[in-house]
Amino acid sequence: MTTVDQYLSAADHAMQQGQPPLALQLLMAALAAFPEHPDILSRLAIDAYRRGAMREAIAYFERALAVDESPGNRCNLAMALCDVDRYASALQTIQALSERQCEDPLIQFTAARAWRGTGNPERALRAISRAIDAAPEDADFRLLRAQISVDQDHWDSALTDIAAVPVLRLSPFQHYRLCGLLMQTGQFTRAMPEYRALVARAPAYAEAWLGLAAACERANDLDGMQDALTRVQVLPLNSAQHAGVNQMQGKLASRRNDNTSACRFLGAAYEADVSDPLWKSQVGFDYGQCLDKVGRYAEAWQVFNTAHATRNRIKTDAAGDHQALDFFALLRVPVSGHWPALAAPADHRPDPVFVVGFPRSGTTLLEQILDARDGLVSFDEQPYLPKTLLALQNDGIVYPSELAALDAQKREQLRNYYFKQTEALVPDRDGRRLVDKNPLNWARVPLIRALFPQAKIILALRHPCDVILSCYMQNLRSTVLG
C-alpha cells in the first residue's frame, strides 16, 4: 500500500519536473486513500492557492484545521481568508493564537492583516510591529506596516519603513507594492525610477506599466506617460487591465485638452466590469469632470452622484491622528482675539508663506505662481503643520488656549520638528522661503502665529457656490481633512 509520504514525495517530484497536473492527480489519489490526513489536505490547499482557486483552497485549509489544529494550519487558513477580503473570519481564526504566540512573526503578520481589514489600525500596528521586531529584514512585514501608516496619514513612519525595505531582494509584486506606497505618500519623482526598474526586470507586468503611467502623469511627464501606455498596450491584458489602460488614456487626453477623446476612454473604463469600488469611484470622478467639460452636464451630475455613493459604501475606519487633527474639532474651540506680538526666532530660518483657503478655492494656482518666483520653493500638499500641532498636543499643551505660555525652548523644538518634516521633499532650500499650501491650515492660524511670527498668510477666496460645486466634482479623500 502506498503511504502518505510516498504520495507526497511523488507529487513533489512531479512539480519539480514541471508537471503540475500530474502532481494534482497524485494528491487527489492520496486524498482518496487518506481522506482526513492533514498533510494531504494542506498540500491540496496550497496547490489550489497557487492556481488561484481560492474557494477550493479555503475549503481544504478548513478541513485540514478541523483534523489538526496546528498553528501552521490556523495561520494558513487566516492568510487565505485575508486574501479574499474575509477579514472578520480571518480574525476569528487567528486572534486567540496571535495573543498566545506573540513572538511568532508570521502569526503576527497574519493577525495584522486581519486587524487592518476589520478596521482596527491600532491593533494591526501593534501586531505588525511585533512581527518586525522578530524579523526586521522581512520585506512583506515592512511593506504592511508602511501601508498601515499610510492608511492613517502617518507618512513619515511609512517612509521610514519604505527606506528599510531591501529593494534589490524584492519580488516583482513586492516591488510593485513599494512603488504604490511611494505614490500614496506623494513621492512621485521617487516612484518613477522604481517603476522603471520594475518594468525593466518584469516587462510583462501590466500593472507596473500602468503605475509608471500614473507616476508620470502626477510628475507632469506626459511623454513618459504616453510611452508607458504604448508599452502596456502590446501586452496580453485582462478586462481589468484594459479598463486601467482606458483610464490612463483618458487622463492623458484630458491633460492634452482633448476632452472628447477623454470622455470616450474614461466612459469605457467607467462601464467596465471591475469589482474594486475605490477604483470605480475614482474613474467616476474623472469621467464626470470630462463630461462637464464637454457640456454633458446632466450625465456628469449622474456620474458624480454614483461615484459619491460608491465611495460612501466603502468601509473607512481610519483612526490614527484623527481625534487630534480633526478639522471640525478645531472649529469648535474658541480662539482668543488677543494676538501678542512675538519676536522673530533666533535661528535665522525664514518663516514660511502659508497659502490657505477652502479646498478648490484656487490655492494650487497660487502655490504654483509663488513657486515660480526666485527665493520661494513649495512642496506638494502635506500635513506638516497638522503633525506639528499633534506634537504640541502630545506634550500635554492645550490648544489654542495655552499657546501664549510656550517658552522659547518649546517654540524652537516645534519649529525644528516642522522644518525637519519639510526636508523629506525639500532637502536643500538654499536659503529659499518655504511655501506651505494646505487649504485648511486657516483653522491653525494661532499655531502659525505662535511658531512663525514672521510668516505670511495668503487667503484664497472664491465664490462659495463655485467652491461647493467644485468640491462635489472631486474625490476628496483626506482622512483628517487637511
Regions found by a protein language model. Give the residues of each.
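Short coil turns that delineate tetratricopeptide repeat
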Residues: 35, 68-69, 102, 136, ...
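Register position in tetratricopeptide repeats
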Residues: 16-17, 50-51, 83-84, 117-118, ...
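PAPS-dependent sulfotransferase catalytic core
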Residues: 282, 298, 302-414
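PAPS-dependent sulfotransferase catalytic domain
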Residues: 152, 185, 199, 205-207, ...
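Start-of-helix register in tetratricopeptide repeats
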Residues: 5, 39, 72-73, 106, ...
